[in-house]
A protein has these predicted regions:
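Generic long, charged, amphipathic alpha-helical segments
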Residues: 31-85
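Short, well-ordered loop/turn and helix-capping segments at boundaries between secondary-structure elements
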Residues: 26-29, 33, 132, 136
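Single conserved hydrophobic/aromatic residue that forms the stacking wall/gate
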Residues: 1-7, 12
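C-terminal structured "cap/appendage" subdomains that terminate the fold
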Residues: 61-130
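Hydrophobic alpha-helical scaffolding
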Residues: 13-17, 50, 120
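Conserved phosphate/anionic-ligand binding catalytic regions in large, soluble enzymes, centered on
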Residues: 13-27
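Intein/HINT protein-splicing elements and their conserved insertion hotspots or analogous self-processing inserts
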Residues: 123, 131-141
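Short acidic (Asp/Glu) and glycine-rich catalytic loops that position anionic groups and cofactors
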Residues: 8, 37-42, 109-111
Length: 141
């Protein structure tokens, strides 16, 4: 890291940004922060509604991470609307919502960043869709 003193200011770097930085900056500008699924830092956020669904949420995270899907779990004791809004602001491509009904039926309620509510799906069926998006490097946000 190059350092130079100019008056009372200090610049950390005196070179233009590099190739990788320019590419990331271009992608962030083009997609307004809503990166394609395969490129998003957090691809899936699992949101549990009840404490009883928290264990299943962790199991789903483990399954997705075993398959290379970057996943976070939100087991906080907050209203589900608040959790969904927070995930939308973070521009997470998929939100998986788990309550007692979903756990009982062995499904997840799926919300997509762009397409909204996709209804209930089997996690393995959804995983196939996600893996296909990663493999094809789909640019749709």
């Amino acid at each position: 890291i190059a350092q130079c003193l100019v008056g009372s200011e200090m610049c950390i770097r005196d070179r233009s940004i590099g190739c990788y930085e320019r590419t990331i900056a271009l992608l962030l500008e083009k997609y307004a922060g809503a990166l394609p699924f395969w490129l998003a830092p957090t691809q899936v956020k699992v949101l549990s509604i009840t404490d009883r669904a928290a264990e299943r949420a962790n199991e789903i995270r483990d399954l997705l991470e075993e398959n290379g899907i970057r996943t976070e779990v939100d087991n906080r004791n907050e209203k589900i609307g608040y959790k969904i809004r927070e995930a939308q602001l973070e521009k997470v491509p998929y939100m998986l919502i788990l309550g007692d009904k979903e756990v009982e039926n062995g499904v997840v309620s799926v919300r997509h960043r762009k397409n909204g509510d996709l209804g209930q799906m089997d996690i393995n069926e959804l995983l196939k869709i996600m893996l296909a998006d990663v493999k094809n490097k789909n640019l749709e946000v």
